[in-house]
């Protein structure tokens, strides 16, 4: 198996009496951007946390290159992730935030300037991160994810807080990652962005896969991805206390 491949198989997880993941299975292959969509509470963020070894499951496996995250030899060189753009120390500059991560993960500090340029933070990287807009915090989080030059990227709602210029940049950035042969899993509520970014789409609801295919396959005979999504998720929206924010947002 290619070291970039994400393979999720039969994930089952409960939060109390609520079944959050119900036999969830899908694969993210190298050289593709896979869009991961579903209503609030569907299990998207929980699934990403399971893949990254942050949550346990009752059953099933989540593998990266054939191994669970906990058994990766150097996780940040193999997997980069953005789950929460607010996971930073606001009193640190963006640059010092990245340097701290690099040192703690035994990555070259020289990568800091490279990833800063990659995400377009410019001189803002010298300012305290607590003063960043959400879009800038997203860029900082992506820079952190890229420090290890990983072959696999997992990003939860990276378009959030982006202005039009930022959205255009993000499209090109994600497509560029896939063109380099990386496997990219991206969740998003902005369905209008996915046709310009994703090769493959996984739609989930109530912890189950509702559809899994290429954009062409999913939209065959329908006018848009939004139409497909609404058809599939009608009846799969259930706002549940404690689960609606995926437990972790």
Regions found by a protein language model. Name each.
Residues 1-12, 238-249:
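ABC-family P-loop ATPase nucleotide-binding domain
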Residues 88, 235-238:
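Active-site/binding-pocket entry motifs
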Residues 104, 108, 231-236:
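Phosphate/oxyanion-binding loops and surfaces in catalytic or ligand/nucleic-acid-binding neighborhoods
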Residues 208-230:
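Conserved beta-strand-loop-alpha-helix hinge in the C-terminal portion
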């Amino acid at each position: 198996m290619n070291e970039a491949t994400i393979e999720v198989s039969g994930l089952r997880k409960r939060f109390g009496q609520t079944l959050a993941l119900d036999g969830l299975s899908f694969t993210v292959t190298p050289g593709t951007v896979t869009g991961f969509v579903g209503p609030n509470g569907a299990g998207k963020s929980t699934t990403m946390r399971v893949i990254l070894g942050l949550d346990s499951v009752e059953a099933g496996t989540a593998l990266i290159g054939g191994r669970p995250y906990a058994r990766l030899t150097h996780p940040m060189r193999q997997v980069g992730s953005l789950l929460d753009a607010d996971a930073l120390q606001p009193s640190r500059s963006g640059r010092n935030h990245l340097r701290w991560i690099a040192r703690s993960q035994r990555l070259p500090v020289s990568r800091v300037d490279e990833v800063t340029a990659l995400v377009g933070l410019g001189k803002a990287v010298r300012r305290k991160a607590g003063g960043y807009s959400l879009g800038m915090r997203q860029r900082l989080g992506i820079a952190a994810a890229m420090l290890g030059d990983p072959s696999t990227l997992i990003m939860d709602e990276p378009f959030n807080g982006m202005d039009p210029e930022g959205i255009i940049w993000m499209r090109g950035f994600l497509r560029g990652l896939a063109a380099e042969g990386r496997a990219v899993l991206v969740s998003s509520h902005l369905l209008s962005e996915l046709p310009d970014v994703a090769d493959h789409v996984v739609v989930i609801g109530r912890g189950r896969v509702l559809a899994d295919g290429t954009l062409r396959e999913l939209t065959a005979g329908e006018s848009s991805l939004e139409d497909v999504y609404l058809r599939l998720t009608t009846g799969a929206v259930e706002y549940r206390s404690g689960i609606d924010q995926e437990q972790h947002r």
